[in-house]
Amino acid sequence: MRVVDYCVVGAGFAGLTAALRLKQAGESVALLEARDRVGGRTFTEVRDDGVWIDRGGAWVGPGQDRIKALMNEFGVPSYKQYTDGKAMMVVDGKQHRYSGTIPLSMSPWVVANLGAVFLELGQMSKSIPLEAPWEAKNADKWDQTTLAKWLAGNTASKPAHDLLETALAGCYTSAASEVSMLFALYQMASGGGPSFLLGVKDGAQDSRIVGGMGAVYAPMAAEIGDSLHLSQPVRRIDQDADGVTVRSDDMAVRARRVIVAVPIAIASQILYEPMLPVDRSFLHQRMPSGAIYKINIVYDEPFWRVDGLSGQSAAPGSPATVTIDASTDARRPGVLCVIVEGPIARRIGELDEAERRRTILAELVGRFGDKAASPLDYIEQCWTTERYSGGGMLSHAPPGVLTEFGPALRKPCGRIHWAGTESSAVMCGWVDGAVRSGERAASEVMQRELVSTA
């Protein structure tokens, strides 16, 4: 049995950060990861030609100071997401090309409705206390309704409704009917509002990392060194008055405390002895992840740029719901990323890969022309079926969950502590939130031990 000061379960950005900060503080650590790689819900693949592809989380934006601090720590630069040229909105088969945030070529009524709803969402999200959204003045009311119901009652134009539902529900990779309005407002608020949540320039997708997210998580793992143990899915955590014992199939770790830094759906698969408190157990049962495909399509060059397009497009109901330019800072080859979320992701998952590819490429030809039909490579990542992700990219709260069980998100259960982007009060749902949660949990366990030994 390996004996250490602290054990960390999960080597995504939350777990890596927690283990790194503990080790830097002079503590002994064992970091156990179920996969044969680190990164969690981020995953950078480097092709034979040296081009890197982010198959998971990829962007950084304003206010995401903790992931940027890690980038600075390891000397990793970023570059701006490509936004030159026109974006495209496809509604009822008609293409609207536009600059800025809203396609002004749509009817004035639709544009006005979009703007009004955006403004209202921004005002509502400002009322959410980030550390305790369940204490908001209207928490009970908002937690009793779904995002879908709220949009239906507050969006007068069908095109505006469909666009907003696609954009907002996509953030939770689930149908809007599955997501609590309180949770949606909380997640918006944690990032600074709906403009940040959905924005590219100066928003959540403002910049990309040179070399991909792997350029950050690889040196973190290297510094953690032989304290990192891959291919060790944790099956059981026992705690007693003196510490915890964490067990995988062929490894046991004894520690004073453990940080569980895996998605909520995966944390629910671990056996805890004694059982977790009821509220935490019920939280595990009630915060699912969604369905998402992230498909990177590689071309000789980003031909859409020559055609005056940014590569950004959105088409409610389409099997290629959202696209964005994912080319590297080298500008060649061109990479177009297709993101498909929620019910549509589940539906295209029923196709075989060849049919899915034909369907996606046909959609892209309709938007970007015949050149889109002949890629060099087609790389799809289905996070829905990732064994140790449990879906993607964020666990969401259905109605009633935050007001009943929200306080259990961060509350330690004896010697078991929790990390992961869902537990972050700031930037919940982003890589930055994962980093923040790891730093918080590392500080928390060390502080608890100082108090217990004082």
Region spans (language model):
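Conserved flavin/dinucleotide-binding core of flavoenzymes
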Residues: D5, T17, A25, S99-G100, ...
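Active-site/ligand-binding neighborhood in enzyme catalytic cores
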Residues: P129-P233, D240-G243, A261, L271, ...
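Conserved beta-strand-loop-beta-strand element in the redox core of flavoprotein oxidoreductases
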Residues: D238-V253
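Glycine-rich FAD pyrophosphate-binding loop
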Residues: K23-D48
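N-terminal Rossmann-like FAD-binding beta1-loop-alpha1 element of flavoenzymes
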Residues: V4-L31
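Short hydrophobic core segments
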Residues: C7-V9, L32, V234, A252-I266
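Flavin (primarily FAD) binding-site architecture
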Residues: V260-V278
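Dinucleotide-binding Rossmann-like beta1-alpha1 core, especially the glycine-rich loop
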Residues: V51-Q123
